[in-house]
């Protein structure tokens, strides 16, 4: 498993333009164990990454404040992940014992029933008065199986008023 990232503040000499990129890769069976009591979870949640194991993920973020009261934030997350298929353990489910795998070798990241997901988000905030914000966001999520058998796309548009609260980012 690895995680690499970089952040560039005031990118290209443009004040208040911040760029961030990240890449995560976890091989099959990485956080699983021979039983669910000793795997890498806490309260049935993965400790290392919400995707568990058997995935490759790329993340890009842009945060820009063009004017003192305006903020623009964009994020794109793309990942592919191998899911278990027809009772065969391909290492994507960390709650499944690694002893149930079919072989000891030959597993690749994304192996099994491969899915590809793209999650894109655009948020715009305007500070009307001190600590009073108007927020607009548009989010698109595309989820599809690599073999083209099934897909699920969703679009979410939100608008809100925020008073004296920090903006929360939900990466899902």
Per-segment meaning from a language model:
Residues 1-172:
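Exposed, low-structure sequence patches enriched in small/polar residues
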